[in-house]
Regions:
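Helix-loop element at the rim of GNAT/NAT acetyltransferase active sites that forms part
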Residues: 19-36, 48-49
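Conserved GNAT acetyl-CoA-binding A-motif
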Residues: 133-135, 162-174
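Active-site rim helix/loop that mediates acceptor-substrate recognition in acyltransferases
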Residues: 35-57
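Conserved N-terminal entry element of GNAT/NAT acetyltransferase domains
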Residues: 1-12
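Conserved catalytic-core motifs of GNAT/GCN5-like acyltransferases
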Residues: 77, 124, 171-173, 186-204
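Conserved acyl-donor/pantetheine-binding loop and adjacent beta-alpha core of acyl/acetyltransferases
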Residues: 77-138
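Conserved acetyl-CoA-binding loop-helix of GNAT-fold acetyltransferases
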Residues: 138-141, 147-161, 183-187
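Conserved beta-strand in the GNAT
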Residues: 59, 65-74
Length: 206
């Protein structure tokens, strides 16, 4: 029987963050075939969290190999300021001449465009759901861990860590085509806060 455990993330987990993010990046499905550069999606949705607030990153591993993670930021506005000042500038320089012939799909094109989207922490802070739900999270599990209660365990672990920081509201974004994820988040206490073109913003008070 496989041994499954949840632990705090280490910097050495970074390759797994990239891999898991890519293999779940197609609304929960493997997005490997959608990218010429397999690291692009993880550069935005996974890796920065390990460097910004690693104590809010946790992995679920099977037989010692990470196969899922949850990554959070306790203050989304502060996280966005850090992205703008520290994380995104090198990526913007690196990908500014990213050859169009290398971009395989619109998914990859849109992912690269995220690096150049100007974040406005001051404006975001005015949104009512940021006041009530200042934290946010991303969670991804490979199929090998799905249906084993590890998604629930990861989110509960993150919730406990947020409460330790006196943070009681958290939000996330989910594609409207990912019905399974939406149902899971509702079971975890998340409710829809607003609709975007790409999907739903959901929040939970913990």
């Amino acid at each position: 029987m496989a041994a499954i455990a949840i632990r705090g993330a280490e910097f050495s987990d970074l390759p797994y963050f990239y891999e898991i993010c890519l293999k779940t990046g197609g609304a929960g499905n493997d997005a490997s075939s959608l990218f010429y550069d397999p690291y692009i999606i993880g550069q935005y949705y996974a890796a920065p969290y390990l460097f910004f607030e690693r104590d809010l990153c946790f992995v679920a591993e099977m037989d010692g190999v990470p196969q899922g993670y949850v990554a959070g930021a306790s203050d989304t506005s502060a996280f966005n300021r850090w992205l703008e000042s520290e994380w995104l500038p090198p990526l913007r320089r690196r990908y500014q001449n990213y050859a169009h012939e290398k971009i395989k799909t619109d998914v990859e094109k849109n992912s690269v465009a995220l690096f150049y989207k100007k974040l406005d922490p001051a404006g975001e802070a005015e949104r009512s759901f940021y006041k009530t739900y200042p934290a946010h999270l991303h969670i991804d599990l490979l199929p090998s861990l799905q249906g084993k209660g590890q998604g629930k365990a990861l989110i509960k672990t993150l919730f406990a860590a947020l409460v330790q920081k006196n943070v009681h509201g958290v939000h996330l974004g989910v594609s409207r085509t990912n019905a399974g994820a939406i149902a899971f988040y509702r079971k975890m206490g998340f409710a829809s806060l607003k609709e975007e073109k790409w999907g739903l913003v959901m929040g939970a008070y913990i």
